[in-house]
Amino acid sequence: MTDKPGIVITGASGRMGQMLIKTVLDSDKAELAGVVEREGHDWVGQDIGIAMGGAALGVVVTDDAGSAFAGAQAVIDFTAPQATIAFSKLAAEAGCVHVIGTTGMSEAEIAQLDPAAQDTVLVRAGNMSLGVNLLVQLTKKVAAALDEDFDIEVIEAHHHHKVDAPSGTALMLGEAAAEGRGVALAEVSDRGRDGITGARKKGDIGFSAIRGGDIVGEHDVLFAAAGERIVLRHMATDRAIFARGALKAALWGQGKDAGAYDMIDVLGL
C-alpha cells in the first residue's frame, strides 16, 4: 500500500490520455490507479503498458469507469463532453477529485457538471498550463486598461486532428478580455467572418482558428488601434505541459472542500 493519491486516466488511448499516463508514472507524488477507455475499444482488457507498446504495468484498461474510480483519489479527464458529464457523476459518487480538460463543451453541458461539484472537488479549465493561465490574467488586465479604440482579436492554431473551434483556451482568453471590459462575451463575440460582412463592430471580440499539421497550441490576443498594436502570445511546443498541470490540479484538490474550481485557483493567480 502507498499513501500516494491514486489517479485514474480516462480516454487512455488518446494523445493526451497517453501523455497523462506517462506523467503519472513518472511522478513520485502519485500512482496510476486505473485507466478507462470506451466500450468496444481494442485496448479494453489489455495491460496499459503493453497497449502503449512497452512492458506490463499491472494496470488493465477497463470500460467500467465506476469500478475504476472506486478507491481512487482523482480522475483526470480529457475526453468528450457527454463522456465528461457521465464521468462527473461517477467521480462524485466515488468521492474522487475530477480534473476536466475536455474542451468544446456548451454552456448547457457545463451546467450539467454543477451537481457533481456539490459533492466533490471539480477542477475544469480549457488549458492546464501555467503560461496560458498567466496569459489569461494579463489579457484581463490589458483589456481593462484599454478602451474600445483597441479592437480585440483572439487567434489560435492547433493540429489538424482537433475537432472543436474556437479552442477552449481561446474562449478562456475571450472571457478574460470581456471580463476586463465589464461585458458578457456572449454579447460581443464574433466567431466567423465570410463574404461581405460590413465593417467591424466596435467593442466586438473576434476569434480566428487555424488547423494544420502537428501544432500543439498557439494563442495570440491582439489589441489593435490606429497606429499601434499589442500582441500577447503563448506557444505550446509539448503537450506535456498540459499533463503536468492536470496532475498538479489533481494533487491540489486532495482535501479541498467540494466545489467548482479552475486553474487560477490551483495556481494561486
Curated annotation (Swiss-Prot):
Its EC number is 1.17.1.8. The active site is at H158 (proton donor/acceptor), K162 (proton donor). It is an enzyme of class 1 (oxidoreductase). InterPro entries: DapB_C, DapB_N, DapB_N_CS, DHDPR_bac, NAD(P)-bd_dom_sf. Pathway: Amino-acid biosynthesis; L-lysine biosynthesis via DAP pathway; (S)-tetrahydrodipicolinate from L-aspartate: step 4/4. GO terms for molecular function: 4-hydroxy-tetrahydrodipicolinate reductase; NAD binding; NADP binding; oxidoreductase activity, acting on CH or CH2 groups, NAD or NADP as acceptor. NADP(+) binds at R38. Catalyzes the conversion of 4-hydroxy-tetrahydrodipicolinate (HTPA) to tetrahydrodipicolinate. Belongs to the DapB family. This is 4-hydroxy-tetrahydrodipicolinate reductase. It comes from Ruegeria sp. (strain TM1040).
